Amino acid sequence: MDLNNKVALVTGGASGLGQATVEAYVDKGAKAVILDINEEKASEIIKNLGEDKVMFISTDIMKEDPVVEAVNKIKENFGGLHIAVNCAGTGYPGRILGKEAPHPLDAFQFIVNLNLVGTFNVMRIAAELMDKNEPDEKGEKGVIINTASIAGIEGQIGQSAYSASKAGVIGLTITAARDLARHSIRVCTIAPGIFDTPLMQLAPDKVRDPLLESTQFPHRFGQPNEFADLAVHIVENTYLNGETIRLDSGM
């Protein structure tokens, strides 16, 4: 799919990997809609890229009504939707048995709800609008890109909720791709390694240093623009479907 003149929704688009994806898509000629809760940061992005190119909608992706309302606004403002990128998510540090007590159940449920249920929620509602598109010259109506993590493949000590939620996103990928194939909508997932995002920058050295050691070549943290480059390629390469792609320097 050619990104020029297309409409892309990006959850978590106000920072980190999502922001880089918004910027890359706009650079390719797309209109971008940021679904996030950080209005201040989104406003800065809109100021830099232009109000005619980027729109912000404050959205709780874990709830049905706000996402339905957001997608309806996209339809009203742009006439349709071609691409959805799910970048919104977070983690919760804690072992299953901590020093004081077991891992809090409510924290586990929140992470799974945000990272996995939120992704599915946006995917299903976005796909409904994409299905109304006329197929392009390659017969395609839409592309959905989800964000997992190598933690969902390799596991990560002290991140049971995060790892489980991202494993769920990976497990969803091929099923979603096959479900939506009859609607001419592709689904792929990116599983990033260790990236230099605002969240990672807040981590203490005792957390960052071992993670950096686990990278192979190049021996460094990934940059958000490298994630965005892959998000661009997935859209443009029509034969990519149902894949979970590791982006981790061979960790």
Predicted regions and their residues:
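Catalytic Tyr-X3-Lys loop
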Residues: 90, 101-121, 145, 169
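Conserved mid-core segment of classical short-chain dehydrogenase/reductases
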Residues: 91-109, 128, 132-138, 158-161, ...
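Catalytic Tyr-x(3-8)-Lys segment
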Residues: 113, 205-226
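Active-site helix of classical SDR
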Residues: 123, 165, 173
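Alpha-helical segment proximal to the catalytic Tyr-Lys
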Residues: 128, 177-179
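Residue(s) in the substrate-gating loop at a strand-loop-helix junction
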Residues: 149
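C-terminal substrate-recognition "lid" of short-chain dehydrogenase/reductases
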Residues: 223-247
